């Protein structure tokens, strides 16, 4: 579960290393984001000489969470870290590569470009 002030690793090569969630999109009173949800975040750590700089406000989709995600078949999937992929207004990733595994639920949320770039889909 991702909420405001949560730090996330960035799982792509957009130039950001760490982001901090400042808003969960999808309703006025929405508190938590899970895998596949879009958040608004601020870049807290970045790679030098890249497109994204510190203190830049970006949109991102959550691809991994430490909190378990329960599937319809009863299986629970849980990752080692909280991670997100930076996206643009249309929902396409800003980077050209995605690092680490992503959940299959992203395909249901129409983030097929992120799923196709990922090395492993769980």
From Swiss-Prot:
Record-level GO BP terms: translation
Superkingdom in the source lineage: Eukaryota
InterPro entries: Ribosomal_uL14 (IPR000218), Ribosomal_uL14_bac-type (IPR005745), Ribosomal_uL14_CS (IPR019972), Ribosomal_uL14_sf (IPR036853)
Gene Ontology molecular function terms on file: large ribosomal subunit rRNA binding; structural constituent of ribosome
Main subcellular location: plastid
Localization annotation: Plastid, Chloroplast
This protein's GO CC annotations: chloroplast; cytosolic large ribosomal subunit
Key words of the record: Chloroplast, Plastid, Ribonucleoprotein, Ribosomal protein, RNA-binding, rRNA-binding
Keyword Ribonucleoprotein in record: yes
Functional description taken from the UniProt entry: Binds to 23S rRNA.
HAMAP family, per the entry: Ribosomal_uL14
Protein family: Belongs to the universal ribosomal protein uL14 family.
Database matches in NCBIfam families: rplN_bact
PANTHER family in UniProt: 50S/60S RIBOSOMAL PROTEIN L14/L23, LARGE RIBOSOMAL SUBUNIT PROTEIN UL14M
Subunit structure: Part of the 50S ribosomal subunit.
Name of protein: Large ribosomal subunit protein uL14c
Organism of origin: Chlorokybus atmophyticus
